[in-house]
Amino acid sequence: EIKPETPEYFYLRPEVEKAYGYTHAVKIGNDIKISGAVSMDDAGNPTAVGDLLQQMKNCYSDLDKVLKHYGCTFDDVVVENVFTTNMPEFLAQAGYRNSIYTKQFPTGSWLGVKELALPEFMIEIELEVHKSH
């Protein structure tokens, strides 16, 4: 039997997200879908331009804020998809993820793409979370 669940939406940067037409995260039951995080300031301007490692750190920082809003950590992440405009540089810096995922790595995909929403963005990371009670 499927029970109805009311989605719970979360905006990290409400004005930016409304301008672009997305919600940063939505929780339904024990599952959370988190939109791709990019390296931006609160006004939506790209940060760490040209520095993929710092952009990656900024993505994880924003994702951590979303996870904490729902009482979760990176240990609850079950899917991580990474989109990057520079796969060789991402692969060279991917070891940073060892400081994020300390118990186990999630499933996911690493995809090299031609471009992201703004030309300055070099990486975008989206997550799916499952929180057991």
Where are these regions (language model features)?
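N-terminal presequence-like segments and the immediate start of the first folded domain
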Residues: 1-61, 65-70, 75-78, 84-133
